[in-house]
Amino acid sequence: AVHVRRWLYGQIIDRPEVMDAMLDPYRLPGPLKKVWTPITRESVRRLYRIEPKAVAHSGQRVEEGLALVEQTLQRGGGRYLVGDAFTLADIAAASLLAPLVSPAGTPWDMFEEGSLPAALRKQLDDLRERPAGQWVLARYAEDR
């Protein structure tokens, strides 16, 4: 989970929607939110070590995790990770990977995708198109 968060924050931490998603639930008055936004952003950077080397390493670990999910699904028939029923394994894996594909109706569905830089949009599209991304989206659409 830490690698998903580190890699993802490495891509999006400077976008205003991220801080809005973190701070808006607290309904801070405008001036207070202005003060807390940079403090929160810097705290997240430190907490998750959002630095190029660590983000790159986390990207590799995320890739390994996605490949493992895809291999597991291929061996088991493709719908669920363990057997032919929705289990805690599916809940855990789908919820940990959901931030990567931003399923509709989740807190991760926070961006107006047209406003994303082309490179980030391509990463999101690539993640959604691969089997693990399709699986996460299906679990959120069908089993939630």
Question: What are these regions, as identified by a protein language model?
Answer:
Residues 1-144:
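C-terminal alpha-helical interaction module
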